[in-house]
Amino acid sequence: MFLKIIVPIVIKRGLMCMENGRIRIADIAEELGLSTATVSNVIHGKTKKISDETVKRVQELLEKRQYIPNMAGILLAQNDSKIIGVVINDHEKYEGHTLEDQFISASVNALAKEMEKADKFLMLKVTGKWSEIPKFASMWNMEGMVLIGFCEQDYKKLREQMHIPFVVYDGYMESSGNLVNIEVNHFDGGVQAGHYLKSRGHKDVLCISDNNICMDLERFMGLKSEIPRAELMVIPMAQEVRTIFYREHLEEIKKYSAVFAVSDYYAMDFIQFLKSVGVSVPTDMSVIGFDNVRECEKFVPPLTTIKQDYNERAAMALQMLKQLKDGECGGKNILLPVTLIERDTVNDVKLHKKCN
């Protein structure tokens, strides 16, 4: 239940008037004997035509009365609004829980920290509709925007509609004009996973993904470059359907000694399924993930995975937005490195054979 409490206080001239518990510019102006325009100009930093003494009087009373400005109005009225929009694709695979996804939450958290450092304001939107993005940007007079989770071959229409700088995470398009594409090296992540599995004697490796395009395809192709016999299994996005799918294909899955999941979420979900059918990880089957979300360390057993640096990408995104705004860059494709993090979900097949 929401309760709105209104406390009207009317006091004689020289004291404060409050409506709804909020101090107004008009109240400050009345107490000082100034115009509301003068007080407003001081609040907005437009003090060139105002005496230092008046500025000081206004600022002191604002502080004394604990005046809280309407920041939204101030920011929207400025050319440099300091508002950075972050748009997340509301993909069906998230099943209505987009912001609960570990990769998404880690990415947003890293961006929030970088924006705090840069004195920017983060405004978040979750949508699956392209048409909502330009509308969102113009409605809030944004300084720039970061798009996450979209895998489209052609951003041309969006570029034409967007008149602000924007950065795309894993955009898979030709960068030009007012945008920069920041990717992690998905192919090399697959290469590192494949090389690691091969060094431990694995030859029959299965890659699981809910699609065979964009970054997931690159991760699989990297794996296959190291292990030519590797196969791709496209799995259902919905968890309940996916569990049924695993059960129906269990005998086929058991033919492989290791599984490379294109995300930590799918890796951990798969391991939970294996546990439910009596398959032990890593004794009976090895598993590698991708992303290195926080839960990897706490998972049982701790998950071996390919790490991408969320903080590095967020810092790069803010840096590129600034450069785009200053006209210093445009049309860039930036590739960030990934690293294999060894934990406890991969068995050494060669060592196991020697012991037997």
Model-inferred region functions:
Residues 2-80:
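N-terminal helix-turn-helix DNA-binding module of bacterial transcription factors
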Residues 111-126, 204-207, 223-243:
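Short beta-strand elements in bilobed, periplasmic/extracellular small-molecule ligand-binding domains
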Residues 247-356:
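Flexible loop/turn connectors
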Residues 1-20, 79, 83-195, 249-255, ...:
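Alpha-helical recognition/docking segments in bacterial nutrient-uptake
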Residues 191-231, 332-345:
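An alpha-beta-alpha
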Residues 180-207, 241-248, 267, 306-326:
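Hydrophobic alpha-helical segments within soluble ligand-binding/sensing domains
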Residues 35, 82, 143, 202-204, ...:
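Short acidic/polar active-site loop segments enriched in Thr and Asp
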